[in-house]
Amino acid sequence: MIYRYAEIKDLDEIMGLYKEASLNEWCTWDDSYPDTGICKKDIETESLLCLEDNGTIIAAISFDSDDIVDNLELWNKKYRNKARELARLVVKDSYRNQGIAAKMILKAMAVLKKRGYKAVHYLVSPDNLRAVNSYAKLGFTKAGECELYGYRWHAYEKDLYYIERSITGEFKRTLWNPFVEAIEKYKLIKDGDRIAVCISGGKDSMLLARMLKMAKDYRLYDFSPEYIMMNPGYMERDMKQMEFNNLLFDIPVSYFSTNVFDDVEEIGKNPCFFCSRMRRGHLYRKAKELGCNKIALGHHYDDVIENVCNP
């Protein structure tokens, strides 16, 4: 699947998605909205992101600029003129219930973050219970309720820098400061380093990846990170959850697959030890393939002890 900005040639296909969605009983759209004029404007201003699967557009979302919505009193005042509305989210009926809507929202938020916005907000019909639950899962907070355009809406908003603010604020003394101090003390990063940041899907490596991304974004060090994740044979549902988590943490991950689990299954004795060694070997090879001179692994104290005892 490919995320990309919609083009004029996609107009009819996207309008077809809107039409299909309008037939659902929970949808507030009709024949007059969204119209081709709105869709065309979104395309021309690069404000319409779509998801393509085998040449077919299966989902779309817009980053709208609506003065009426943007100036609602219920929004947090500190984001005034620094927030953008997410609008016209649509997923092809045959692709629903696969988490695609949530991924579209996360992709849109990543785009808006790069454009300098601090927050996003969204109006959703209270009848669309699936969407209401999705926003809570994605960390949106309910700002209130309003009546607009003849409908009742639930209003949600999200700080795009919530994770960064937590790490450098609430957890500054326990996470961010020790992280930076360790890099400085042990000279872990040098100018020009190309570092393969290896993500397993667990909280240790996820946190490490997020903080290294912050170090890069804040230009604390002159290095190039490559975020990689190996699939050693995870179940499909587990892999999808990990992909979702990477989107949620705004980490641009490259994925590659191996047969480690199948190979280890044939080993009767000490499978965990061999699994660890094999996975590490694949990570080293991938890092070299990407031209990296270092790798970064996230370990807690128990991991460190096990690695020292089983080098």
Language model region names:
Residues R96, Y122-V132, L148-R152, N231:
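Conserved beta-strand-loop-alpha-helix junction that forms the acyl-donor binding cleft
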Residues I2-G16:
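A short beta-loop-alpha structural element at the N-terminal edge
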Residues V91, N97-A110, N133-K137:
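Conserved acetyl-CoA-binding loop-helix of GNAT-fold acetyltransferases
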Residues I105, L112-V124:
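Conserved GNAT acetyl-CoA-binding A-motif
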Residues S47-S62:
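Conserved beta-hairpin
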Residues K19-K41:
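Conserved GNAT-fold acetyl-CoA-binding loop/helix
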Residues S166-N310:
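ATP-dependent adenylation/nucleotidyltransferase module used to activate substrates
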